[in-house]
Structure formats: C-alpha cells, structure tokens
C-alpha cells in the first residue's frame, strides 16, 4: 500500500481503528483528515459536564500532536473534505488533495434539530466543539428545556437537575426511552427524575421558540408556553452520509456496509456512527470497538466477517443507572419485572419462553453479565 490508508474523521471510531491498524502494520502510511481539532476527548462525558462544572477544555485527554507522534500518523485538522473521486482514489478539500489505497469514512453523526420556527435558538451537545460554543450559556442558564426523552435527553435532564437547575424534559411519546423499552420498564427512571424535580412534558410537541427579554419562550402545539434560559435538542442523531453520497457510495439511514465494513465501492469502508451495518445503525462503543478490530485485519487482506455478540447498553443516569441488552424495543415480548428497593430486573420473554431482552438497574446491574450469557440472539 504505497499510498496508504486515509481515515476521514477523528472521533472514537477513527482512533480505535488507528490503534488496531498499528497492531497489524507499524509503517503503512496512515492519514487522518477531520474538520475539528483532532484532540481526543471522551464523548460520553458530555452527559455530565454541567453537574461536574467542567469546561470544554477540561474534557481533552490527549492533544492531536501527541496522538500523531504515538501512532506515526499524518494529521490534517480543521479541514473539511469536499469530495471523493472513488475511481481515481483521491480525497479532495477546497485546496488540497490526497491519494489513497484504502479509504475509511468515520464521519460520525450529527444531532437532529427539529425543523420548527426558532430552531436556531436550540443548542446541541454532540461534541466537545458544540459544548465549547455554548458552555457559558448553559452554565449561566437556570431554567433549561430539554427536547427529547431518549438516552441522551434523560441523561442530560438528570445532570442539569443535579447541578441545581430547573429542568423541563419534553417528548412526543407517552414515556421516556420509548424507542428502547416499554413504559412499564422505563417508569422507574421516570418516577426518579420526577422525584428529583424534573418537570416532564410527555405527549407534547414543541411548535416554536422565540427570543424574549426574559430568555426564550417555548410554545407547544397545545398553545401552552414556558419561559426558559436555554433549550437543548436531544432528539436523536443522523449519520453523516453527505460525503459518501457525493462519492457515489450507497447510503440509506447511514453509509451502507456489509459484514466486512465495506461499502458499495471495494476500496471504501465505513465505521462508527456513520455506518449502517447490514441494515443496522449501532452508535454504541462496543460495536465500534469490535468493528475496528475486524476492519483493521480486513484492510490488510483478512476476510473475517464482523460478528457482534449480545451487548450491554449503559444509560448514564448516575442516581438511577440502567443497563439494557437484547431486543428491548420489541412490542411482542412479555415482560417479567421484579422491582425492589435495591433495584429492578425486567426480563423480556418471547412467546416460546426465551429471554430476548433485559433491563437491570442500580444494585441489580451486577446480574447483567449472567443474564447476557442466557440471552437468545
């Protein structure tokens, strides 16, 4: 590979891949190009920055230059790739171009902001860069509206509440974590947030935002309005597919890849939050770690398909932490729930009596790994 490997992106997926590539080959030319500074930070920490009084710069774990030296890389930070000529094996920015033998897209996902009037007033917390842009406003805000009651919205609601702020959490659904589990399972977290003082607005739709002297007025579809100091969009992520689309690579919800992380073009691969692996978008750390291991080998002639075991997803709500695994979103499961003062175990059983999903909380989380071994996948 005389021209080497180019990775577009600098997040967790890109870094995991770099580490695994260097286990395969210490000298192959390896280039990373990204629109940000390329400094390393732990993205899940963004769910706790307010209660821990952290500034954006406090999140930095390793400077880009140190990473480049450690793994023998060429880095091009603060550069936005404009186009890919897949046939010529060339990546282009506005004023530079690079040739490659193999190209990996690790472009991540962007926070979805609902298309409502006043959407420009909504903040997002999907990167260190985004937090840096709004950290002063969020620290100073006393009244915060979080739009979206999924994983990130629930985590942020607890964090802002722990920091002493007045928090309203809004979602279209009738329960929290509605896309992940039924209400009888998520109700424990819902009650705990309410007990902490979080004001829940469920089955509610945001219609518009407008700047007023006292802050921001949020108007619901019901015409009810509330006044807040900051509004955060936690309404999900959208895989970044624009670059792949321009290159003629197949995209659906994400950049379409097979079990080898290969796109519709034989020398272009995708990994991480931007990738749709055999129809599944898996924006979690463990699938990314495994993807990086398999892809690094396959870039050097390996032929091993990615096999993902049953994996735990951790909800980072420290006052009522949850672990979940399996097909928790399935509507045809029968849930067996044991809830006691020390925690909850909820088992989702199929009609054939097989364990297909589970959710555990608090002190019962220690039983997660034993349950994981009995999970039918």
Curated annotation (Swiss-Prot):
GO molecular function ontology, one term from the record: oxidoreductase activity, acting on iron-sulfur proteins as donors, NAD or NADP as acceptor
The keyword Translocase appears for this protein: no
Alphabetical UniProt keywords: Cytoplasm, FAD, Flavoprotein, NAD, Oxidoreductase
Pathway membership: Nitrogen metabolism; nitric oxide reduction
Major subcellular site: cytoplasm
Catalytic activity, EC: 1.18.1.-
Reactions this protein catalyses: 2 reduced [nitric oxide reductase rubredoxin domain] + NAD(+) + H(+) = 2 oxidized [nitric oxide reductase rubredoxin domain] + NADH
Cofactor(s) of this protein: FAD
Domain of life: Bacteria
GO terms for cellular component: cytoplasm
Localization per Swiss-Prot or TrEMBL: Cytoplasm
Gene3D superfamilies: 3.30.390.120, FAD/NAD(P)-binding domain
InterPro entries, sorted: FAD-bd_OxRdtase, FAD/NAD-bd_sf, FAD/NAD-binding_dom, NO_rdtase_NorW, Rbx-bd
Pfam family, one: Rbx_binding
Function, in words: One of at least two accessory proteins for anaerobic nitric oxide (NO) reductase. Reduces the rubredoxin moiety of NO reductase.
UniProt cross-references to HAMAP family, sorted A to Z: NorW
Family designation: Belongs to the FAD-dependent oxidoreductase family.
NCBIfam families referenced in this protein's UniProt entry, alphabetically: PRK04965.1
Name the record gives this protein: Nitric oxide reductase FlRd-NAD(+) reductase
Gene: norW
């Amino acid at each position: 590979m005389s021209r080497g490997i180019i990775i577009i992106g600098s997040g967790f997926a890109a870094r995991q891949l770099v580490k695994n590539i260097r286990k395969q080959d210490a000298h192959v030319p390896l280039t990373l190009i990204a629109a940000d500074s390329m400094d390393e930070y732990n993205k899940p920490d963004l769910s706790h920055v307010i209660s821990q009084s952290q500034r954006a710069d406090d999140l930095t774990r390793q400077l880009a230059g140190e990473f480049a030296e450690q793994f023998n890389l060429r880095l091009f930070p603060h550069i936005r790739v404009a186009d890919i000529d897949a046939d010529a094996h060339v990546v282009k920015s506005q004023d530079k171009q690079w040739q490659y033998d193999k190209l990996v897209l690790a472009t991540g996902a962007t926070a979805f902001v609902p298309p409502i009037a006043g959407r420009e007033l909504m903040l997002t917390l999907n990167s260190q860069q985004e937090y840096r842009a709004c950290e002063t406003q969020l620290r100073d805000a006393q009244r915060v509206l979080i739009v979206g009651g999924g994983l990130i919205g629930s985590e942020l609601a607890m964090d802002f509440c722990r920091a002493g702020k007045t928090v309203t959490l809004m979602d279209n659904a009738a329960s929290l974590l509605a896309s992940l589990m039924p209400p009888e399972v998520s109700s424990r977290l819902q009650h705990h947030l309410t007990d902490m003082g979080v004001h829940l607005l469920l089955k509610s739709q945001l219609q518009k935002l407008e700047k007023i002297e006292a802050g921001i007025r949020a108007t619901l579809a019901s015409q009810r309005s509330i006044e807040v100091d900051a509004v955060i969009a936690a309404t999900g992520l959208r895989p970044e597919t624009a670059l792949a689309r321009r290159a003629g690579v197949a995209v659906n919800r994400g950049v379409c890849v097979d079990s080898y992380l290969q796109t519709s073009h034989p020398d272009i691969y995708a990994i991480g939050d931007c990738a749709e692996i055999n129809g599944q978008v898996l924006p979690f750390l463990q699938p990314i770690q495994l993807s990086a291991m398999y892809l690094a080998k396959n870039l050097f002639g390996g032929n091993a398909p990615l096999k993902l075991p049953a994996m735990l997803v951790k909800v980072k709500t420290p006052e009522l932490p949850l672990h979940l695994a399996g097909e928790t979103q399935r509507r045809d499961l029968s849930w067996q729930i044991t809830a006691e003062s020390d925690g909850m175990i909820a088992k989702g059983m199929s009609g054939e009596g097989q364990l297909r999903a589970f959710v555990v909380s608090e002190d019962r989380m220690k039983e997660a790994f034993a349950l994981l071994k009995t999970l039918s996948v």
